[in-house]
């Protein structure tokens, strides 16, 4: 059973924002001295992104923005663009991620670079990193608040790229058994947790929360991100439906929670055997499913580890802010989301 997904319809917030950005009068501002045909931008940028953003998604990060806002005391309706900023940034990271991994699919369709070619997909993914800055400007925030947003967003983007560099630059054979857990935790916090932390803190920033509340929500979001990465890594091994993801991780020798947990769960002899099989998988001398079958029994109860991690994150949040509105609803949403990793 998969978690319910949100399909970005013609009237979705992302569609509305994208249509506004590519309105004829807006495109005319880019080239005021000539009647350059808007079809060039539409074909290379608008149409591919309209299709990509229309693919089903869960909008969990947007929910985190709303939660942060409510915890910080916000009562008015949020501007249309604010919760979508993180979804836009996330969409950009997915496009770039798929290019770097040469993934074949994303959200039920071909990866964007497989659809429109690498150059256009690369430009589209990068454009999604910068569009939120323009949307922030359009919110007409007080100068100090806008500066805080930009600083938080820039730090998040920097951390995400540090995490991606570690994901691309370090493989299993290069990290010792004792260093696996801290390396995987660092990677997960930077690459996945940073965006979730920004989502949680951005709502609080908009509500004018104190620095301590902003820091608490950022930390909470980071830990949620780490928990979701745990689910993602484990699901790639345990779920038949998500086997392609698990196989891809093994073929690329990625640092995942699977290997961090294996380093704790088995003795040195067994770990060496699994590592040798991993080397064969990376060399394409062994099918990754053979290694998956060897790993599954060892990690069959490790979903409990994920639950303990998430329970701790929610417990720390409650200790800091009390039984704030929206926390229970987010927990229920997360329970449904968890099923998408099965």
Predicted regions and their residues:
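N-terminal amphipathic/basic leader segments beginning at the initiator methionine
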Residues: 1-35
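Amphipathic alpha-helices that form helix-helix packing interfaces
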Residues: 14, 21, 25, 30, ...
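Charge-rich, solvent-exposed alpha-helical interaction surfaces
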Residues: 17, 48, 294, 298, ...
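Mg2+-dependent prenyl diphosphate-binding active-site environment of isoprenoid biosynthetic enzymes
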Residues: 39-271
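Amphipathic alpha-helical protein-interaction segments enriched in hydrophobic
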Residues: 249-252, 307-310, 327-332
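Mobile late-domain/C-terminal helix-loop "cap" segments
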Residues: 273-318
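Short, amphipathic C-terminal "tail helix"
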Residues: 321-342
